[in-house]
């Protein structure tokens, strides 16, 4: 699956960083680190892009697809599933990535980063299905 490759790559990038110097302590730090990596790869990256219902964490535009990432942070294993559900619901309710989509494929991914010292990676993710909202 395409989204699995993306998440694995992000986890490799995050694992390569010096955690003492660049600790991921919250969602905004995670978002910034991923943004810097994606910009360094010369991708068209939008962070906190507004639509009429809210702001998506990260949007990456490619020629034939758009990838939307909704990130959640926790440092507790027992919160991961709830955070994943929250991210998925937010993507669906807010319609992230639908604006000016054109004929690109839309890939929406809900992600949970666990900052616990024994984890320090994206531990749960899910490709969001059936979130297309009719635009009138």
Residues of each region from the PLM?
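Structural signature of nuclease core domains in nucleic-acid processing machines
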Residues: 2-136
